[in-house]
Amino acid sequence: MPTKPRHIPRNFFLDQKSRYQKNGLTPLPHQIIHPFYTPTRAAELSACSKEVRGKLLEGLKVVPALVTDWKGKPLLRNRFIKFDTVKGVNVWLQGYASRRKEAEGVIYRTLEGQPEKLITPSKLHRSNVPLVDKVTELFGSERTKHLNSAALDSIVDELVNDREKNLFCEDVYIYLLQHHVNSEGKLIAIIESIKSHMEADIDQLKVAETLILQLVLSMQRNRLPVTKELVNAYHQLIDAVNQKFYTNACELQFDPLVTQCILEFHIMSGDLNHSKKLLSHLILNGWALREDLSVKYLQLVESKVRDEDIDTRTLKRFAYISDFRPLLQRAQTPLFFAALVPYCRHFGELYSLLTVITEKVHNTREVFDVTLLSMIEATTHMGKNNRYKSANLYELHRTVLPYYDNNLPAKFVKAFALQFAKFNNWSAIAGFFKQYPSYFTPNSIASLLSASQEGVTDSTNYPGGVVQMRKIFIWEYVLPLYSKMSLRARSSISATFDTPKLFTEAIKQELKLVSAGQADVMNELIAMGYESNLLRFIPATTWEDIFRVPHLVAALKPFSQEIESLSGKAAGATESSQ
C-alpha cells in the first residue's frame, strides 16, 4: 500500500533570515518602528569597529519592531540590535539611515485653512421660509435630551417637497446643525434623520462629507459631551454612507481637512484604533496635522495603553506612534516632546530626542523648560551602573546648558544635584555649588547627603565617586554650614561622619550648638561613634565639655563605661604629652 509522502516543513527563515545575525533576532531596518531613534556617529563607529558582537543601544531589548513568525504572521516585539560579525554592519546602518530619511520626507504638505469654508451655505433662512418656525418650535431653546426624529423627518420632507422653495435636504440639515444644536439629544435626532434620508435624497458623497463635517464642527463649537450614544449614532451614520456609496472607509476619501476634523472627534471620543487609522492615512498621503492634535493623540495613547509591565506598555505605545517621525521633524510644541520622553528606555533614544529638539525646534529653551525635569528623572534609569548613569546625566547637562546662557534655573540645578548625589558623584555636585552658591541652603545640602545614602550602592570606582572625594565634599561644603542646619537635617546626616576627622569636627559643632542652648543630635552622634569605634578619637578636652552638660551625661549612660575609659586614656595621653 503506497504511503503518504512525507511533508517536509518549509524553513520560512531560509530566505528571510537576517544576514546580520544567525538567530534572526536582530530586526531588519524596515522592521523597526521606532519614530525617533537615530544612532550617533560614535555608536555607528563602535558597532563597525568590533569584529564580533557589535551592537547598538548596548544590545538591550528596547527596539520596537514588527517582525513575522514562521507562518508570516506579523508580530510586535521588543528586539535588540546585535551583530555576530562586523561583516554587513555598515550595510545595515546604511539601510536604516535610508529608511529614516525616507520616513522624514514623507510629509510635504501642511493642513492649513478653516474647515468651515468647505461648507456650502444653506439656502434655508428664517426670513424667507415661514415653515422654519415649526423647526424652532420642535427644537425649542432648551437643551432637550431626547427628540422625536420622526417629527423632524416630516418637516424635512415638507420643506424639500415644496418646489417653490427649491431646497435640498442638506440645506435643512446644515441650517439645523448651525443654529439648533445645543444638546446631545438634538444632535442625535438630526443624525437619525440624515440616515433616513440617505438612501433617497443624498446622492453625492460630497454632500455626505459636508454634513459630517458640519456635524463635527457643531459638536466642537457647542462643546457637547462625546457620549457613548452620540458616538454610536455617528458610526451608524458612517455605515449608512459607506453602504450608500459602496465604500468601506468613506472617512479616508474625504478632503484631508475634513479627515483631520473627524480625527479630532475620534480622539475626543477615546477611539484609539480609529484615530490611529486616520492619522496614518493623513501621514501616508503627505499631510501634517495640527500639532495640538498630535499632542492630544499622544495623550490618548498614554491614557489607553496601561499595561502593568513597562516594556509591554512601551512597546504597544510605540505601535501607535510608529509613523510619527515626520511629525517629530516639524514639531515645535513643548508638550509634544514631553509626551515622548517616557518612551525612552536607553540614553541613545533620549539623546536622539535631544538632537531633534536642538536642531529642529525654534523655541528650544521653552521646550526644555517643560521637558528637562522629566529628562533628568528618565536619565537616572539609563545605564548599567552609576558610572554610566552619571556620564549620561552629565551629557544631558552639557547639552542643555548653552540654551540657558550657562545659567540654569534653580529647579533644574537642584534636580541635577540630587541625581548626582544618588550616584555619589561629589565632584559634579561641588561644581554646582561653586557655580550656583545661592541655590543651595544648608538644609538642601544635607538632603543631598541623605539622598546619597538612599541611592543604589555601586562598587564601580570612577572619578568623582571615590570615597576620598566624598570626605572632601563633607569637609569643605557640609561642615562649614553644619551649625545653620535644622535639627532634622543634622540628624539625617549624622551617619555620614564616619572618619575620625569628620566625626570629631561634627562633635565640636554640636557642642557649640549645645552651648548656645539649641537642640542637638549629640546622642545620635555618640551612638554612631560607638558602633563605628570612633569615640576614641574624641579629645579629652572635648569629653570634659560634654560632661559639663547634665542632659548629655544622662543620655550617655549606656556608653558610660567605655566613655570613662576612653576619656581617661585621652586625659593620660594629654598629660604625658605635656
Curated annotation (Swiss-Prot):
Keywords: Mitochondrion, Transit peptide, Translation regulation. GO terms for cellular component: mitochondrion. GO terms for molecular function: translation regulator activity. The keyword Repeat does not apply. The keyword Transit peptide applies. It holds the Pfam family AEP1. InterPro entries: Aep1. Residues 1-15 form a transit peptide. Transmembrane segments: none annotated. Belongs to the AEP1 family. Required for translation of the mitochondrial OLI1 transcript coding for the mitochondrial ATP synthase subunit 9. This is ATPase expression protein 1, mitochondrial. The gene is AEP1.
